[in-house]
Amino acid sequence: MAKKITGYVKLQVPAGSANPAPPIGPALGQRGLNIMEFCKAFNAQTAQLEKGMPIPVVITAYQDRSFTFELKTPPVSYFLKKAAGLDTKKKPGSGSKTPGKGATVGKVTRAQLAEIAEKKMKDLNCDNVASAVQMLEGSARSMGLQVEG
C-alpha cells in the first residue's frame, strides 16, 4: 500500500548550502520532518552544481513523517541574468527598475535564449523550443533586458 501524502513544501534553496536556518527549518519543522536529513540529502544531490545557484525543490511529506524531494531547474531569471552578465547573487527576478521604458540593464541574444529554453524545457509549459524562446523573450523584456538577433 502506498504511503499517505500529508502535503507538499515548495522552497528555493541555494545549491550546496541547505541548512536548518529559515526558510528550510520552519517549513519542514511544521510538518514534523527531519530537517538535517533533508539538508544532508539536498547538499549531496546538488554538490556537482554551481554553489549558490538557486534550486527550486518540491518536498513531499508523508503521514509517517518521511519525505521525498524533487529538484527542478533554476529559475529563468537566474539564467537570463547569467547570459546578460549581470550579478546573479541579487534576489531572484531583479532586473531593471523600469522595464519597457527605454532603460535596459543588459542584452541577450536569441541563440542564448534557445540554449536556456533547452535547459528549462521540462519545467516550462510548452511543446517546442520556439514557443519556449518566445516565453523567455517576454521574461527577458520584463526584466529590462534587450533581446537581439
Curated annotation (Swiss-Prot):
Coiled-coil segments on the chain, per record: none
Pfam families for this protein: Ribosomal_L11 (PF00298), Ribosomal_L11_N (PF03946)
UniProt entry keywords in alphabetical sequence: Methylation, Ribonucleoprotein, Ribosomal protein, RNA-binding, rRNA-binding
Gene3D superfamilies: Ribosomal protein L11, C-terminal domain, Ribosomal protein L11/L12, N-terminal domain
GO biological process, one term: translation
Sequence intervals crossing the membrane: none
Keyword RNA-binding: yes
Its biological purpose: Forms part of the ribosomal stalk which helps the ribosome interact with GTP-bound translation factors.
Family: Belongs to the universal ribosomal protein uL11 family.
HAMAP family: Ribosomal_uL11
Full protein name: Large ribosomal subunit protein uL11
Originating gene: rplK
